[in-house]
Amino acid sequence: MDTDTFPAIPATPPPPPPAPTQPAKKKGSFAKKAVLGLLLIATIAVFATIGYVWWTESKIERIDSAELVSLATVAPASGEPVNFLVIATDDRSSLPDDWNEDAFGEFAGRRTDVMMLAHMIPGERIQLLSLPRDLMVDIEGNGTNRLNASYVVGGPDLLVKTIQQETGIPVHHFVEIDFGGFGRVVDSLGGVTIDFPLPARDGKSGLNVEAGAQTLDGEMAVAYARSRQYEVYENGSWTGTGGGDIARTQRQQDIMVQLFNQVASPSSAFNLPTFLPTFADNITADEGLSLGLMTDLGRAALGLNSSNIDRITLPVKNHRGSDGRSYVIPTDAAAAVIAAFKAGDPYP
């Protein structure tokens, strides 16, 4: 065979062709992607928050401004003191099915069992002034009657008007809640804790608690707030404590202060997703009281505690009217209390 017809085999194979060059990565590309990702997450969170706020605020039942014309026409500027009228009614129609309805009687309609003015100085203090429902007042177009009658005959607007005329205190916002709604709000926070020095009961309202710090559920909290025949167990027997409606307003303030403490507590963060929509779903408010305003006031109140809350019931005394009915009327001390409320000063 002729070997010259075959090409010679090289001693070493030729080197492989060079790999294609990769484009150099631009510095900072990962950081830019991370920033864009965070911006996207923040945008989603903002829109989710806006949606949540809108959804929550949409649950509030509003009173048309044309039906609540007596509110103070000049609203305070942001950060300025603001006055609320907070009322609770005895409307039985929304009571939860598992509550004992026998404790609420047979009254049809609704009356104001709680009338409380709140003066909020953002970030500084809150003042509460309870008004007795039997306070003798002059109701426009209806003559002399008890304060809570103004709500029965003329609704929220006439009540606001009567209170402003009798006290000289401007009311900027109005909030109403009924028994059932108040109970649901309490339950949304896991109950409200009240300290009882002695066992207490009220056979009419349904209150029945042992001594010590007791966490009341919504139904029992309402029973405590409604109690007018409050009894304590001492020295082997039950004894009435007296005080009637005035003592009851003090118990109502107890609950308000304790609820405030619980909402302001860091531990309440776990309950807020339930509390906020429950609160909104169970109140009626004027159109000007936006959830944004409530949130701003709530944020300003987070730095406060019960020592920053002054509370009092308007000083009154018993009085028999010319119509033969029982009323209460302001004492000489009432003027100084009202003046302190208006000024945001400590009560005398």
Predicted regions located by residue number:
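Flexible, polar/acidic helix-loop-strand segments at domain edges
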Residues: D187-F270, P348
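C-terminal solvent-exposed extensions
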Residues: S94-P96, L135, L216, T284-P348
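Extracytoplasmic/secreted envelope proteins and their assembly/folding machinery
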Residues: T112-M115, T144, P156-Q164, F179-G183, ...
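Entry/capping segment at the start of metal-dependent catalytic domains
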Residues: K25-G123
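Second-shell loop/turn segments in exported
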Residues: A103-E106, N145-V153, G168-H173, A211, ...
